[in-house]
Swiss-Prot record:
Catalyzes the dephosphorylation of undecaprenyl diphosphate (UPP). Confers resistance to bacitracin. Its main location: membrane. The gene is uppP. Belongs to the UppP family. Disulfide bonds: none annotated. It comes from Synechococcus sp. (strain WH7803). The chain crosses the membrane at residues 50-70, 97-117, 127-147, 165-185, 200-220, 230-250, 262-282. Keywords: Antibiotic resistance, Cell inner membrane, Cell membrane, Cell shape, Cell wall biogenesis/degradation, Hydrolase, Membrane, Peptidoglycan synthesis, Transmembrane, Transmembrane helix. This is Undecaprenyl-diphosphatase. The keyword Cell wall biogenesis/degradation applies.
Length: 286
């Protein structure tokens, strides 16, 4: 059973939100699940559930970072779509990327809306329990291992088609299950879909921008109904730390995958899931 946690003071709230911002920034874009880590880290630190008001607002940092990092790509996509509308040049790489991003965003939008409308108990469902998150982490590690082992890795971003957006977009829906990882599911699907590792990661990030932004804004409205300890200052610290670390994580992963495989993430997710199960079994927590 979880014990009651007292409301933190200002300095503790600043430290908590700073750490949560770092965790958010690291885990949002690395294929290791931000939801899992944002659930587990506060429990291990003895902070309890930080609440929607904290996690939703801090996520703004990651949204700002990913849009800023890929601003040139997004501008090129907008120019490509605009040119295609005016001149019918839908076969240009930028236009095809825009189409793929649009198609790939629709499945998670519909699935997320369906959950909001028809599954009121989602936030407290067994899917969000520690053993479920641990099991999902292990399963996703195995799927990523298979994709790494058997994916042909020949496709580049300028070859993207609408079907790629649909395939990876359907995989993105799995991110609604805590512990899956949005970037993990889309990266895994892209590797199965024959993408080269750096292009798979880049497409995963670009495809995720609409979903991350919309989800963040939807959750943000709940922040105004939940007062946060310490007021605005801790949240601002969390936003800034999330933005900085998100930028660094995106940049690092794109460079890392130029020369390395995803096996390090497979191993991490396996260990994370196993250790999480061991901790849960030993503590008797839910």
């Amino acid at each position: 059973m979880e014990s009651a946690v007292s409301e933190p003071g200002l300095l503790e709230a600043i430290w908590r939100d700073f750490v949560l911002g770092v965790v958010q920034g690291l885990t949002e874009f690395l294929p290791i699940s931000s939801t899992a880590h944002l659930k587990i880290v506060p429990v291990l630190a003895g902070w309890g559930d930080p609440g929607v008001s904290v996690t939703a607002v801090i996520q703004l940092g990651s949204i700002v970072a990913v849009i800023a990092y890929f601003r040139a790509d997004l501008a090129a996509v907008l120019r490509g779509i605009s040119g295609a509308v005016r001149r019918g040049q839908w076969r240009e790489p930028e236009a095809r990327l825009g189409i793929a991003m649009t198609i790939g965003t629709l499945p998670i939008l519909f699935a997320g809306l369906a959950i909001k409308l028809y599954w009121p108990g989602y936030e407290t469902s067994p899917l969000r329990s520690v053993p479920a998150i641990a099991g999902v982490s292990i399963l996703m590690a195995l799927l990523l291992a298979l994709a790494e082992r058997f994916g042909p890795r020949s496709k580049q971003l300028d070859q993207v088609q609408g079907r790629d957006g649909l395939l990876v977009g359907l995989a993105q829906v799995l991110a609604l299950i805590p512990g899956v990882s949005r970037s993990g599911s889309t990266l895994t699907a892209s590797l199965f879909d024959s993408w080269k590792r750096p292009d798979a990661a880049r497409f995963s990030f670009l495809l995720g921008i609409p979903a991350i932004t919309i989800a963040g804004l939807v959750e943000l409205k709940d922040a105004f109904t939940e007062p946060s300890a310490g007021g605005v200052l801790p949240l601002m610290v969390g936003i800034v730390s999330a933005a900085v670390v998100s930028w660094l994580a995106i940049d690092w992963l794109l460079k890392f995958l130029q020369r390395h495989s995803t096996w390090v993430f497979v191993i991490y997710r396996l260990l994370f899931g196993i250790l999480l199960l061991a901790w849960w079994a030993g503590s008797g927590s839910n």
